[in-house]
UniProtKB/Swiss-Prot annotation:
Amino acid composition bias (Polar residues), ranges on this chain: 129-150, 165-178, 453-467
UniProt cross-references to InterPro entries, sorted A to Z: C144A/B/C
Compositional bias segments (type: Low complexity): 543-552
Positions of disulphide bridges: none
Biased composition (Basic and acidic residues): 1-11, 528-537, 563-583
Gene: CCDC144BP
Segments for region (Disordered): 1-25, 87-188, 213-260, 453-485, 528-586
Name listed for the protein in its UniProt record: Putative coiled-coil domain-containing protein 144B
Lineage: Eukaryota, Metazoa, Chordata, Craniata, Vertebrata
Keyword tags: Coiled coil
PANTHER family in the cross-refs: COILED-COIL DOMAIN-CONTAINING PROTEIN 144A-RELATED
Coiled-coil region(s): 215-244, 490-546, 648-713
Length: 725
């Protein structure tokens, strides 16, 4: 058995100090856990009790389960153990009582006070060898634990947790027992019981107990320091008694509980401070709730007025270039809006007109909101409101000019681009066909590159511009109210520049969209024309082939009519026929390759010429083959010509497929641009809604500020009237 702490401080008559006794429980109670017990080394009963219990627990595994630890005890958390030690050392009886039994209504106050005094060394009664329980009553011995089981029926059951300490002071049931033959009654015997502090834990708790239970010298010095600090606290708090009358009202109640033992009570305790802090926090919460109620009432009143006059919130869908017509709507706003609102003056009328004018310009997102927010940060400064009004008027004048200029520039730019487009088309039609084919190739490559860059830049540019707008709008609301007017003007100019860039990008996207639509229409027309040409060529070829077959059947008649030509053709060498065949191939293939490489806008004329030339060559070959029907190479020649025609048709079909692919690409581009336009419209609507919400909040806050100022001015006016009267 190990113990920490000193012997009796003042000999036999001094108050004992707390000590910790270590035991190890067997498997039947806990699986070999170290347990620590708190007691007084001067109290022989407590030391003998812990030692005998430890011996019995080591000796037998059946008896310790029904020992003193099975008595009802109080639960104490590990976090409150340090507070209990400090309260016991400093003599803070209410603090110990608060830790041991914070809500125990079943224990009598007097019994609880007597049990707590055992833990407080300053107030424990001086013991003599005659008053010890083992000298007066031999039955009262640690081995006879049945008495404690009988007398401790009123206290609570001890539930030992794995990591939670507990204190078990014994509570007497019979308080009216009398002293006979020098024996003490149960209450005075149990005054000697200092309790058992059960610490289930580890070596950290052992170190904690050593640090909180020093030896004699260290404990004496600590007690002296505590007395000095308690005296200083008394002097400090005597000066605060006039300011805090609630603390003095709590002291007599504490004195009533402890009037029989004449225990001095300290004026300030931790739980008193906590209660005061809770009271202050409750006051703050009530104040905040009142403010919220006032703001809600103001919002409701503003909503009623808003519904009554129906201020236009935001248009659903409007054209992009109609800002010049929006300025006229400001005159139609009813001026009775400010007269019907209670507490509003002429300044409110100007402020409302300013906010409504901002609603008529949705492109201007946030220039004057920052200036309007300043009165919210400085509710008691009157100059800020005038600055806000003047700056908002300035912004309005500038934004009107900017919107007019933007509209003029945008319309002029669109007309100029349309004119240029038509002029370019007319000049291209007037050029030579050869020059047109070369330039169309270059234009096609340039258009492909431009479309790729457009796909990349349009997606990234619009999103990046919107993302770049967001932090600036947020920074406007988060700027400090003490910023100079120069910084405000600078931010306003930056925001206008960003908005102008955004407008320009939207205009360019619209122009590109229109150009793509026109190109799409042209491509559709060209594809239809080419399909018609293919159909006509196929019908002509089928007709010529049928003529050739009929001619092949009537070869005998031709031989009778033209015998000389037959002989001449028969006498021709095979080389000559081969050369003619190669010439025909050279005539057909280069034109086919040329047709494959040409642009769709010039294919129509070239295809007509090509089909006509191929048809003539084909007819010449058929005539030659008619003359050379006896030649063995006549049949392969016909097959070769037929294959050439099929190859030509395949090339044209491939060209049609390429055109369809281009059409699909253009349609995809159009859909992408439409999505981007819809997204930009959505962002505009969202920004307008945010702007309107912020203006509503500003209006509510201004009303609240004016009402508060009116409430503050009312008592001043009353005082002035009283003084004047």
């Amino acid at each position: 058995m190990a113990s920490w702490g000193g012997e009796k401080r003042g000999g036999a008559e001094g108050s004992p100090k707390l000590a910790v006794y270590a035991t190890r429980k067997t498997r039947s109670v806990r699986s070999q856990e170290d347990q620590w017990y708190l007691g007084y080394p001067g109290d022989q009963w407590s030391s003998g009790f812990s030692y005998s219990w430890w011996k019995n627990s080591v000796g037998s595994e059946s008896k310790h389960g029904e020992g003193a630890l099975d008595q009802p005890q109080h639960d104490v958390r590990l976090e409150d153990l340090g507070e209990l030690h400090r309260a016991a050392r400093s003599g803070d009886v209410p603090g110990v009582e608060h830790v041991l039994a914070p809500g125990d209504t079943g224990v009598d106050k007097r019994d609880r006070k007597k049990s707590i005094q055992q833990l407080v060394p300053e107030y424990k009664e001086k013991q003599t060898p005659e008053s010890l329980p083992q000298n007066n009553n031999p039955d009262w011995h640690p081995t006879n634990l049945t008495l404690s089981d009988e007398t401790c029926q009123r206290s609570k059951n001890l539930k030992v947790g794995d990591k939670s300490p507990s204190v078990s002071p014994s509570m007497p049931e019979n308080q009216s027992a009398t002293k006979e033959l020098g024996q003490m009654n149960l209450t005075e015997r149990e005054k000697m019981d200092t309790g058992v502090v059960l610490l289930s834990g580890n070596d950290t708790l052992h170190d904690l107990c050593q640090s909180q239970l020093p030896e004699n010298k260290e404990s004496k010095e600590a007690e002296q320091d505590l007395e000095l600090t308690s005296e200083e606290e008394q002097e400090r708090l005597k000066g605060c008694e006039n300011k805090q009358p609630q603390k003095t009202s709590q002291e007599p109640e504490m004195a009533k509980d402890c009037d029989r033992e004449d225990i001095p009570i300290y004026p300030v305790l931790p739980h008193v401070q906590k209660s005061e802090e809770m009271w202050i926090e409750q006051g703050k919460l009530e104040w905040k709730n009142q403010l919220k109620l006032v703001i809600n009432e103001l919002k409701q009143r503003f909503g009623e007025i808003y519904e009554k006059y129906k201020i236009p919130a935001c248009p659903e869908e409007e054209p992009l270039l109609d800002n010049s017509t929006r300025g006229t709507d400001v005159k139609d706003i009813p001026f009775n809006l400010t007269n019907n609102i209670p507490g509003c003056e002429e300044e409110d009328a100007s402020e409302i007109s300013v906010s409504v004018v901002f609603e008529t310009f949705p492109e201007q997102k946030e220039p004057s909101l920052k200036n309007i927010i300043h009165p919210y940060y400085h509710p008691y400064s009157g100059s800020q409101e005038h600055v806000c009004q003047s700056s908002s008027k300035l912004h309005l004048h500038e934004n009107k000019l900017d919107c007019d200029n933007d509209n003029k520039l945008g319309i002029g730019h669109i007309f100029s681009t349309d004119n240029n487009f038509h002029n370019d088309a007319s000049t291209k039609k007037a050029r030579n066909p050869e020059v047109v084919t070369v330039e169309m190739k270059e234009d096609q490559e340039f258009d492909l590159q431009m479309t790729k860059n457009m796909n990349q830049n349009s997606d990234s540019g619009s999103t990046n511009n919107y993302k770049s707008l967001k932090p600036k709008l947020e920074n406007l609301s988060s700027l400090p109210p003490d910023s100079d007017r120069t910084s405000e003007v600078y931010l306003h100019e930056e925001l206008q520049q960003d908005m102008q860039k955004f407008k320009n990008e939207v205009n360019t996207l619209e122009e590109e969209f229109l150009a793509l639509k026109k190109e799409n229409v042209q491509l559709h027309k060209e594809v239809e024309e080419e399909m018609e040409k293919h159909r006509s060529n196929s019908t002509e070829l089928s007709g010529t082939l049928t003529d050739g077959t009929t001619v092949g059947n009537d070869d005998d008649g031709l031989n009778q009519q033209i015998p000389r030509k037959e002989n001449e053709e028969h006498d021709r060498p095979a080389d000559k026929t081969a050369n003619e065949k190669n010439k025909v191939k050279n005539q057909i293939y280069p034109e086919a390759d040329f047709a494959d490489s040409m642009e769709p806008s010039e294919i129509a004329s070239e295809d007509c010429e090509l089909s006509h030339s191929v048809y003539e060559n084909f007819m010449l070959l058929i005539e030659q083959l008619r003359m050379e029907y006896k030649d063995s190479a006549s049949l392969p020649r016909i097959q070769d010509t037929f294959c050439l025609c099929e190859h030509l048709l395949k090339l044209k079909n491939n060209h049609c497929d390429q055109l369809t692919v281009k059409l699909k690409q253009m349609e995809n581009m159009v859909s992408v641009l439409q999505n981007e336009l819809s997204e930009t419209k959505k962002t505009k609507l969202q920004l307008e809604l945010q702007k309107i919400e912020w203006e509503k909040e500003l209006y509510d806050l201004r009303l609240a500020l004016k009402q508060e100022n009116g409430r503050k001015e009312m008592p001043i006016c009353c005082i002035i009237k009283i003084v004047n009267s």
